[in-house]
A protein has these predicted regions:
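Sec-dependent N-terminal signal peptides of Gram-positive bacterial secreted proteins and lipoproteins
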Residues: 3-23
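Conserved C-terminal helix/tail region of periplasmic/extracytoplasmic solute-binding proteins
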Residues: 331-358
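Bacterial lipoprotein signal-peptidase II cleavage site
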Residues: 18-29, 38
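Pocket-lining segment of extracytoplasmic ligand-binding domains
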Residues: 121-122, 130, 194, 198-296
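Short, solvent-exposed loop/beta-turn-alpha elements that line the ligand-binding surface or hinge
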Residues: 84-91, 162, 239-249, 319-327
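Short, glycine-/small- and polar/acidic-enriched structural segments
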Residues: 34-40, 46-188, 193-194, 212-218, ...
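A bilobed periplasmic-binding-protein/Venus flytrap-type ligand-binding module shared by bacterial periplasmic
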Residues: 79-81, 145-156, 250-268, 319
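Secondary-structure end/capping motifs
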Residues: 263-340
Length: 358
């Protein structure tokens, strides 16, 4: 009932709005750089007349500062970004796209973002680090990790023994998920892992033949495969996680966090965001919208070409899970990580205060 009321409120606000233009995001490079701040990508068609950016602000009185990572977390937001550019949202929005979590963690801790899309384990770490000033509000990405190989020697996890895997995500979900699977398979001491800063950097190394074995998330798996026909997906870490966890948890890669003060002081804006973001995810994940969603992903600078975006989107495990279901799923995942390595969740299993259920 709460979600229905929130959605009804957001829809009522949205229907009274006009439209406005925005600025396109800069395409991602393979080098680590400062995160990009953009109002929103340009709308894909001309906005309606008699519109202004102030129209949205008159409804909630709030411009939300939103950060996301260049990958599935941002891909689920692209329709919201376009709607914001048209002025068709209840909130004003300023989006920041980053290449890695390290680029935005400091700003989240300082309260410089109202909302951010981050790895799920990082939500727990931020909750501890800020003494409860950051809360988990929704899950947005399930399992998207794959081991990609230049060859055909890896047929099972046991084949990783004695190998070196290149990966990204040190200190976040990819590292701890891989470590958990290796530990459960008795390979913790027989596999070396070398970390790179950004997914795009690692995908480029694979494509150029400079790495033979890598752990990558979508959509960068699709990007690498499209650029080098000698590459193949060797292992799906979601399947390997399920085998290791034996039903105890679900691999949950990404989530939405928000400042506790923002949630408490701006309940209408928070409810409107959740409704607008859920609608964006529904649009992006609808097969009927694949062409349009791929165009928006490229328009936002997340991926360089529409064919790659179209190939990647169905495999990005983009989702929206909020409320009690979010709490149940996330808590099970974090408990598994904690039991495997307490530092994965900031040293202690978070209490129920982590979860914002509306």
């Amino acid at each position: 009932m709460k979600r229905f009321c929130s959605l009804l409120l957001a829809l009522t606000l949205i229907l009274s709005l006009g439209a406005c233009g925005g600025s396109p995001a800069t395409p991602e490079t393979t080098q680590s750089s400062a995160p990009e701040s953009v109002s929103a990508p340009e709308p894909s068609s001309p906005p309606a007349e008699n519109a202004s950016s102030e129209a949205a602000l008159e409804k909630t009185g709030k411009t939300l500062r939103v950060a996301a990572l260049k990958g599935p977390t941002a891909m689920g937001m692209v329709k919201l970004m376009e709607d914001a550019a048209r002025g068709e949202t209840a909130n004003g929005y300023q989006f920041t796209l980053a290449g890695s979590p390290d680029e935005i963690v400091g700003s989240i801790v300082k309260g410089e973002f109202d909302i951010a899309a981050v790895p799920t384990n990082l939500a727990a770490t931020l909750y501890h680090k800020t003494q409860g000033k950051v809360q988990l509000v929704a899950l947005n990405t399930l399992g998207v990790l794959y081991v990609v190989e230049a060859g055909d020697t890896i047929q099972s996890v046991s084949d990783l023994a004695g190998k070196t895997i290149y990966s990204t995500g040190k200190g976040s979900t990819p590292e701890f998920a891989l470590n958990y699977i290796l530990e459960k398979n008795g390979l913790a001491d027989s596999v070396s892992v070398e970390y790179k800063t950004e997914h795009a950097e690692l995908a480029a190394l694979l494509s150029q033949g400079q790495a033979e074995l890598a752990l990558l998330p979508q959509p960068f798996v699709t990007t690498a495969l499209a650029q080098n026909d000698k590459l193949r997906v060797a292992l799906d870490l979601t399947q390997e996680w399920d085998k290791a966890a034996q039903g105890a948890s679900q691999l949950t890669m990404g989530c939405i966090v928000a400042q506790t003060s923002f949630l408490e002081e701006n309940p209408a804006a928070a409810a409107a965001f959740l409704a607008e973001y859920e609608a964006s995810v529904a649009f992006v994940t609808d097969p009927a919208n694949l062409d349009a969603a791929a165009a928006l992903v490229v328009q936002a600078g997340i991926l360089p070409k529409e064919p790659v975006a179209k190939a990647a989107l169905p495999h990005c495990a983009i989702t929206f899970v909020a409320g009690e279901e979010m709490k149940k799923t996330a808590s099970g995942f974090l408990e598994v990580l904690y039991n495997a390595d307490p530092k994965a969740v900031g040293g202690a299993l978070p209490d129920d205060g982590l979860y914002y259920t509306g």
